[in-house]
C-alpha cells in the first residue's frame, strides 16, 4: 500500500473516532499499519485515550463505523482499560493520529510508562523466585 492510501485510512479512522468521541484526548494507530507492514487483509488497530472516568459508550458501533468507512476490519481499544503490556505497545510503537492537549497527553503517557516499568519489575521478581525455588505463587 502506498503511503497516501495509508494516510487516507488513518485520516478516515481518526475522523470517525472523533465524530463519535469528540472529547477524546488522543487517537493512536498501532500494529502492522503503524509499522508499515500491513497486508490487504490486515485490520486497522486503533487505541483511544478518553478523559478519566469516561469509556467508549458503544464500542461495537464505533468498530463497525470505522470498518465501513475504511472498507476493512478494524479493532478499537480504550487505552485506559487495557493492560500495561498492550498500553506500552501502543505508546512505544504506535503512531499518534490526534491529540487534543499535547501536554496533558504527554503527562498521561509518562505515567502509563512508569506503571509499566513497575509492573515489569514485579514480574521480574516473580520469575526470579520461580527460577530459584521452582514454585509459583499460589502453591
Predicted regions and their residues:
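Catalytic core of pol beta-like nucleotidyltransferases
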Residues: 1-26, 34-40, 51-139
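Short beta-strand->loop micro-motif that forms the acidic, two-metal-ion catalytic signature
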Residues: 45-48
Amino acid at each position: 500500500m502506498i503511503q497516501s492510501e495509508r494516510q487516507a485510512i488513518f485520516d478516515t479512522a481518526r475522523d470517525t473516532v472523533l465524530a463519535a468521541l469528540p472529547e477524546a484526548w488522543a487517537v493512536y494507530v498501532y500494529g502492522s499499519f503503524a509499522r508499515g507492514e500491513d497486508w490487504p487483509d490486515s485490520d486497522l488497530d486503533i487505541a483511544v485515550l478518553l478523559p478519566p472516568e469516561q469509556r467508549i459508550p458503544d464500542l461495537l458501533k464505533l468498530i463497525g463505523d470505522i470498518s465501513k468507512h475504511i472498507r476493512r476490519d478494524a479493532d478499537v481499544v480504550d487505552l485506559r482499560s487495557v493492560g500495561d503490556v498492550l498500553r506500552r505497545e501502543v505508546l512505544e510503537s504506535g503512531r499518534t493520529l490526534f491529540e487534543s492537549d499535547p501536554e496533558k497527553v504527554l503527562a498521561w503517557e509518562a505515567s502509563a510508562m512508569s506503571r509499566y516499568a513497575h509492573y515489569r519489575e514485579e514480574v521480574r521478581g516473580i520469575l526470579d523466585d520461580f527460577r530459584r525455588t521452582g514454585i509459583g505463587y499460589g502453591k
